Regions:
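Conserved beta-strand in the GNAT
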Residues: 55, 61-70, 85, 90
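Conserved acetyl-CoA pyrophosphate-binding loop and the N-cap/start of the following alpha-helix
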Residues: 95, 99-107
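Conserved beta-strand-loop-alpha-helix junction that forms the acyl-donor binding cleft
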Residues: 107, 118-131, 148-151
Length: 151
C-alpha cells in the first residue's frame, strides 16, 4: 500500500499532518502549538530524498503517510542494533477503522526488514489511548515509559 512520497503529495501530507499535530497541541501545549504547516515543504522534500517518507493512496488520493528514521544504537554495555523509528503515522480521520493503518504498519515492518533493521520502534503520547491500543493490536509492546515533572 505504501509508496515513496513525491513532491506533488506535499499539500495532502501536510493536511494530514495538521490532523495529528492538532491532537499533540491539545495534549501537550507546553511543547506544541497549532500551525498550518507542521511538516514544512523543505523537510518533506529532505525526507523523500532520504527515502523516509511514504504515502498510502486509494484511487490516486493520499489517505495516509508515514515518516521514518533509521536509528543506530550502540554504547558501553549495550548490544549494537539498527532500528527503524516510526516518527509519524497518519490515516485521514474520515477513513480510520478500515484497516488502512494496519496495512501501513505491515508495510513499514517490511521496509524495516529491507533496510536491515532489527526492530521497529515508535513513541506515543500516554493520553492517546486509541493509538496505544492500535499499536498493540499491530504487535508493538510497551517497553519504556518516559516521565516528566514541572519544576
Amino acid at each position: 500500500m505504501l509508496e515513496l512520497a513525491r513532491e506533488g503529495d506535499w499539500e495532502a501530507v501536510n493536511a494530514l499532518s495538521v490532523q495529528i499535530h492538532d491532537l499533540h497541541a491539545a495534549w501537550r501545549p507546553d511543547i506544541y502549538f497549532s500551525t498550518e504547516e507542521p511538516l514544512p515543504k523543505a523537510l518533506f522534500l529532505e525526507k523523500i530524498r532520504e527515502r523516509m517518507l511514504y504515502v498510502a493512496k486509494i484511487d490516486g488520493i493520499v489517505v495516509g503517510y508515514v515518516l521514518l528514521q533509521i536509528m543506530k544504537k550502540d554504547g558501553p554495555g549495550t548490544v549494537e542494533k539498527k532500528q527503524l523509528r516510526l516518527e509519524s503515522i497518519c490515516v485521514d480521520q474520515a477513513l480510520r477503522g478500515h484497516g488502512i493503518g494496519k496495512q501501513m504498519v505491515a508495510d513499514v515492518r517490511a521496509l524495516a526488514k529491507a533496510f536491515g533493521c532489527r526492530e521497529l520502534i515508535l513513541g506515543v503520547h500516554a493520553e492517546n489511548d486509541h493509538a496505544v491500543g492500535f499499536y498493540q493490536k499491530c504487535g508493538f509492546r510497551i517497553r519504556t515509559i518516559n516521565m516528566d515533572m514541572k519544576v
